[in-house]
């Protein structure tokens, strides 16, 4: 009985130790489970962070790709519009002074010419490079009150009462390289190179009278092709722009000052055109510079 008791005690005691060991094992397993859960949570968290970062990166890549695609579409649209305008010269966007002129009335045509010149005078002059007064006065002959280069920088006012032959001149050929484009867009040629002096005679018709004028080439000669050239001459108060091909005159534009106003004479083949641009009052500051020079 004692042995049974002892045995029982031993059993109970052993059972207690087993319980203790079991509780320790349970605690260890619980700790391991807790650690595993923590590690698993950290892994999940890392995966989520990694997934979120991938999503953000994908969004950024998509945004950049979408922006690039949009810019490419806009660029292609601009290029296609430009090419379409070239292939369709009579389109609304590419209409010039010489386009569809046969369909215009006389009043519409004159208004179109006026609008064209006003736009060129308003926007083209700002693109001209600035030049110093001394350089300008050096290469352009003095008029009654100022050098022609300074005169050509002025706010010219077209006098529509003195536009002779303009309609016939433009209706006969495209409007290009005439007074407005030559002076307000390209600018007066800067005579800053030394050339061998060359004299020439030009026959000019003015007020029904013919004049043979001697001109001295002090300007510049632009070679367009092997036998094609553009030359500038100055004499007195006149600037001449002459286009030649194999020595033959193709076109001529004369700019000359008369009583402070700028007169322009264009001649191309059998067509000619005369225009007058009135000059406003010159500023006192500019007047003082002219006197000093």
UniProtKB/Swiss-Prot annotation:
Which residues are listed as membrane-spanning?
A: 55-77
The alphabetical list of record keywords is: Membrane, Transmembrane, Transmembrane helix
Q: How does it sit in the membrane?
A: Single-pass membrane protein
Q: What is the name of this protein? A: Uncharacterized protein B0228.6
Species source reads: Caenorhabditis elegans
Cellular-component GO terms for this entry: membrane
Q: Does the keyword Transmembrane apply?
A: yes
Cell compartment(s), UniProt: Membrane
């Amino acid at each position: 009985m004692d042995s049974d008791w002892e045995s029982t005690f031993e059993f109970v005691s052993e059972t207690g130790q087993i319980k203790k060991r079991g509780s320790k094992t349970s605690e260890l397993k619980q700790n391991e489970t807790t650690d595993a859960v923590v590690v698993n949570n950290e892994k999940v968290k890392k995966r989520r962070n990694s997934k979120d970062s991938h999503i953000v990166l994908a969004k950024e890549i998509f945004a950049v790709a979408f922006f690039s695609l949009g810019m490419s579409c806009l660029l292609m649209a601009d290029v296609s519009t430009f090419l379409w305008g070239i292939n369709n010269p009579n389109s609304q966007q590419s209409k010039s002074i010489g386009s569809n002129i046969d369909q215009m009335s006389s009043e519409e045509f004159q208004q179109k010419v006026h609008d064209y010149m006003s736009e060129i005078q308003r926007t083209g002059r700002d693109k001209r490079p600035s030049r110093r007064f001394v350089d300008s006065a050096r290469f352009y002959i003095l008029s009654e009150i100022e050098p022609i280069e300074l005169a050509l920088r002025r706010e010219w006012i077209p006098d529509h009462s003195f536009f002779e032959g303009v309609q016939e001149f433009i209706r006969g050929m495209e409007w290009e390289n005439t007074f407005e484009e030559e002076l307000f867009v390209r600018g007066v040629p800067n005579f800053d190179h030394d050339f061998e002096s060359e004299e020439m005679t030009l026959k000019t018709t003015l007020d029904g009278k013919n004049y043979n004028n001697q001109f001295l080439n002090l300007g510049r000669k632009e070679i367009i092709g092997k036998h094609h050239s553009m030359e500038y001459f100055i004499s007195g108060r006149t600037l001449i722009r002459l286009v030649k091909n194999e020595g033959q005159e193709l076109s001529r534009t004369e700019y000359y000052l008369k009583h402070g106003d700028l007169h322009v004479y264009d001649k191309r083949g059998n067509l000619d055109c005369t225009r007058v641009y009135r000059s406003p009052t010159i500023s006192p500051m500019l007047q003082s510079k002219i006197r000093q020079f």
